[in-house]
Amino acid sequence: MRNRGEEAYNYFLQGYNCSQAVVMAYRDFFPSHALDTILSLSSPFGGGMGRLREVCGTVSGAFIVLGSVYGFNVPGDSEKKKILYGKMQEFAALFEKENGSIICRDLLGLKGRSTPNPEERTKEYYKKRPCPKLCLLSASILEEFLINNGVLDEEGEIKK
Protein backbone atom coordinates (compact mmCIF):
# COMPACT_ATOMS: atom_id res chain seq x y z
CA MET A 1 0.00 0.00 0.00
CA ARG A 2 1.14 3.50 -0.75
CA ASN A 3 2.06 5.51 2.34
CA ARG A 4 1.46 9.16 1.59
CA GLY A 5 2.31 10.08 5.18
CA GLU A 6 5.84 8.71 4.78
CA GLU A 7 6.10 10.49 1.45
CA ALA A 8 5.20 13.84 3.05
CA TYR A 9 7.66 13.18 5.89
CA ASN A 10 10.45 12.53 3.40
CA TYR A 11 9.60 15.55 1.26
CA PHE A 12 9.87 17.74 4.35
CA LEU A 13 13.28 16.25 5.11
CA GLN A 14 14.31 17.06 1.52
CA GLY A 15 13.69 20.76 2.20
CA TYR A 16 10.12 21.37 1.11
CA ASN A 17 8.11 23.36 3.63
CA CYS A 18 5.29 21.67 5.55
CA SER A 19 2.52 22.68 3.16
CA GLN A 20 4.54 21.72 0.09
CA ALA A 21 5.47 18.36 1.63
CA VAL A 22 1.82 17.37 2.01
CA VAL A 23 0.98 18.64 -1.48
CA MET A 24 3.92 16.68 -2.93
CA ALA A 25 2.61 13.48 -1.32
CA TYR A 26 -0.53 14.06 -3.43
CA ARG A 27 1.23 15.31 -6.57
CA ASP A 28 -0.70 12.76 -8.65
CA PHE A 29 -3.85 14.85 -7.98
CA PHE A 30 -2.42 17.63 -10.16
CA PRO A 31 -1.36 17.72 -13.81
CA SER A 32 2.38 17.03 -14.01
CA HIS A 33 2.95 20.19 -16.07
CA ALA A 34 1.41 22.25 -13.23
CA LEU A 35 3.52 20.87 -10.37
CA ASP A 36 5.89 23.86 -10.25
CA THR A 37 2.89 26.18 -10.09
CA ILE A 38 1.23 24.10 -7.36
CA LEU A 39 4.46 24.14 -5.34
CA SER A 40 4.71 27.91 -5.73
CA LEU A 41 1.06 28.37 -4.75
CA SER A 42 1.48 26.19 -1.65
CA SER A 43 4.77 27.79 -0.55
CA PRO A 44 3.26 30.76 1.38
CA PHE A 45 1.40 28.41 3.72
CA GLY A 46 4.54 26.99 5.35
CA GLY A 47 5.25 28.04 8.92
CA GLY A 48 1.59 28.56 9.66
CA MET A 49 1.20 31.00 6.75
CA GLY A 50 4.55 32.66 6.20
CA ARG A 51 5.76 32.00 9.76
CA LEU A 52 2.81 33.91 11.21
CA ARG A 53 2.20 30.66 13.12
CA GLU A 54 -1.49 30.58 12.28
CA VAL A 55 -3.10 27.52 10.58
CA CYS A 56 -0.53 24.71 10.38
CA GLY A 57 0.98 24.44 6.91
CA THR A 58 0.29 20.71 6.82
CA VAL A 59 -3.41 21.47 7.25
CA SER A 60 -3.26 24.13 4.54
CA GLY A 61 -1.53 21.63 2.25
CA ALA A 62 -4.32 19.14 2.90
CA PHE A 63 -6.86 21.87 2.13
CA ILE A 64 -5.15 22.46 -1.23
CA VAL A 65 -5.51 18.76 -2.02
CA LEU A 66 -9.16 18.83 -0.92
CA GLY A 67 -9.66 21.82 -3.21
CA SER A 68 -8.34 19.77 -6.12
CA VAL A 69 -11.05 17.17 -5.43
CA TYR A 70 -13.99 19.19 -4.15
CA GLY A 71 -13.14 22.74 -5.22
CA PHE A 72 -15.35 25.03 -7.26
CA ASN A 73 -14.56 27.57 -9.95
CA VAL A 74 -17.97 28.99 -10.79
CA PRO A 75 -18.90 32.11 -8.83
CA GLY A 76 -22.02 31.62 -6.77
CA ASP A 77 -21.87 27.81 -6.79
CA SER A 78 -23.08 27.58 -3.21
CA GLU A 79 -23.63 23.81 -3.32
CA LYS A 80 -20.02 23.02 -4.27
CA LYS A 81 -18.80 25.64 -1.79
CA LYS A 82 -20.83 23.98 0.96
CA ILE A 83 -19.39 20.56 0.07
CA LEU A 84 -15.79 21.84 0.00
CA TYR A 85 -16.08 23.74 3.27
CA GLY A 86 -17.75 20.74 4.90
CA LYS A 87 -14.88 18.45 3.83
CA MET A 88 -12.34 20.98 5.08
CA GLN A 89 -14.07 21.19 8.45
CA GLU A 90 -14.25 17.39 8.70
CA PHE A 91 -10.53 17.09 7.96
CA ALA A 92 -9.66 19.89 10.41
CA ALA A 93 -11.65 18.14 13.15
CA LEU A 94 -9.78 14.87 12.52
CA PHE A 95 -6.40 16.63 12.60
CA GLU A 96 -7.33 18.56 15.74
CA LYS A 97 -8.56 15.41 17.47
CA GLU A 98 -5.20 13.76 16.80
CA ASN A 99 -2.97 16.76 17.55
CA GLY A 100 -4.94 19.05 19.87
CA SER A 101 -4.99 22.03 17.50
CA ILE A 102 -4.69 23.09 13.87
CA ILE A 103 -2.75 26.22 14.86
CA CYS A 104 0.99 26.17 14.19
CA ARG A 105 2.06 28.11 17.31
CA ASP A 106 0.02 25.76 19.53
CA LEU A 107 1.53 22.69 17.89
CA LEU A 108 5.05 24.12 18.29
CA GLY A 109 4.47 25.49 21.80
CA LEU A 110 5.27 29.05 20.72
CA LYS A 111 3.82 32.38 21.71
CA GLY A 112 3.10 34.91 18.99
CA ARG A 113 4.56 35.19 15.53
CA SER A 114 8.05 34.50 14.23
CA THR A 115 10.41 36.50 12.08
CA PRO A 116 10.13 35.87 8.34
CA ASN A 117 13.56 34.23 8.38
CA PRO A 118 13.34 30.44 8.04
CA GLU A 119 15.48 28.40 10.39
CA GLU A 120 18.37 26.41 9.02
CA ARG A 121 17.47 22.74 8.67
CA THR A 122 20.03 21.14 10.97
CA LYS A 123 19.95 17.98 13.09
CA GLU A 124 19.00 20.14 16.07
CA TYR A 125 16.12 21.68 14.10
CA TYR A 126 14.68 18.25 13.33
CA LYS A 127 15.14 17.11 16.95
CA LYS A 128 13.20 20.04 18.44
CA ARG A 129 10.46 20.37 15.84
CA PRO A 130 7.37 18.18 15.41
CA CYS A 131 7.02 19.40 11.80
CA PRO A 132 8.20 16.21 10.03
CA LYS A 133 5.84 14.15 12.17
CA LEU A 134 3.00 16.60 11.53
CA CYS A 135 3.61 16.24 7.77
CA LEU A 136 3.34 12.48 8.19
CA LEU A 137 0.20 12.73 10.33
CA SER A 138 -1.58 15.25 8.12
CA ALA A 139 -0.93 13.31 4.91
CA SER A 140 -1.92 10.04 6.63
CA ILE A 141 -5.15 11.49 8.04
CA LEU A 142 -5.92 12.88 4.59
CA GLU A 143 -5.21 9.52 2.96
CA GLU A 144 -7.64 7.73 5.28
CA PHE A 145 -10.17 10.55 4.79
CA LEU A 146 -9.96 10.23 1.00
CA ILE A 147 -10.25 6.44 1.16
CA ASN A 148 -13.34 6.76 3.36
CA ASN A 149 -14.81 9.30 0.93
CA GLY A 150 -14.25 7.07 -2.10
CA VAL A 151 -11.56 9.22 -3.72
CA LEU A 152 -8.70 6.78 -3.10
CA ASP A 153 -8.80 3.00 -3.26
CA GLU A 154 -7.64 0.81 -0.36
CA GLU A 155 -4.08 0.94 -1.73
CA GLY A 156 -4.06 4.73 -1.50
CA GLU A 157 -4.25 5.28 -5.26
CA ILE A 158 -6.72 7.56 -7.02
CA LYS A 159 -9.79 5.62 -8.07
CA LYS A 160 -10.15 5.49 -11.83
Locations of the language-model features?
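Polybasic, low-complexity association/targeting segments
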Residues: M1-G15
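Conserved phosphate/anionic-ligand binding catalytic regions in large, soluble enzymes, centered on
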Residues: L52-I64
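Transmembrane alpha-helix interface/packing and boundary motifs in multi-pass membrane proteins
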Residues: P44-L52
